[in-house]
Amino acid sequence: MSSTLDTQHDVVVEKQPARTAPPPMYQVVLLNDDYTPMEFVVKVLQKFFGKNSEDATRIMLQVHHEGRAVCGVYPRDLAATRIAQVSQYARARQHPLQCIMEPA
């Protein structure tokens, strides 16, 4: 914190550091479908969400059994980017895999 002297009024004004709120976070949720192979889902989780083999398999099984699972939690722009990347990658390989973004 720094101080400055207001010479006209002989008052010391202390500057407060700027405070910024953390950005709102969003979870990326992978949705189940009847056509995308489980191995492909594991690959997507590893490639786009940085999951190791064990975590990717666990999330894939949750998607398979419960219909959905959270892949990660990110600021809005990064979550939207991950969704676009997954969608483009899946479509290019003829898979209907979908994910959505929800407030965390």
Swiss-Prot record:
<dbReference type="InterPro" id="IPR014719">
    <property type="entry name" value="Ribosomal_bL12_C/ClpS-like"/>
</dbReference>
<dbReference type="GO" id="GO:0006508">
    <property type="term" value="P:proteolysis"/>
</dbReference>
<comment type="subunit">
    <text>Binds to the N-terminal domain of the chaperone ClpA.</text>
</comment>
<dbReference type="InterPro" id="IPR022935">
    <property type="entry name" value="ClpS"/>
</dbReference>
<dbReference type="GO" id="GO:0030163">
    <property type="term" value="P:protein catabolic process"/>
</dbReference>
<dbReference type="Pfam" id="PF02617">
    <property type="entry name" value="ClpS"/>
</dbReference>
<dbReference type="InterPro" id="IPR003769">
    <property type="entry name" value="ClpS_core"/>
</dbReference>
<comment type="function">
    <text>Involved in the modulation of the specificity of the ClpAP-mediated ATP-dependent protein degradation.</text>
</comment>
<comment type="similarity">
    <text>Belongs to the ClpS family.</text>
</comment>
<protein>
    <recommendedName>
        <fullName>ATP-dependent Clp protease adapter protein ClpS</fullName>
    </recommendedName>
</protein>
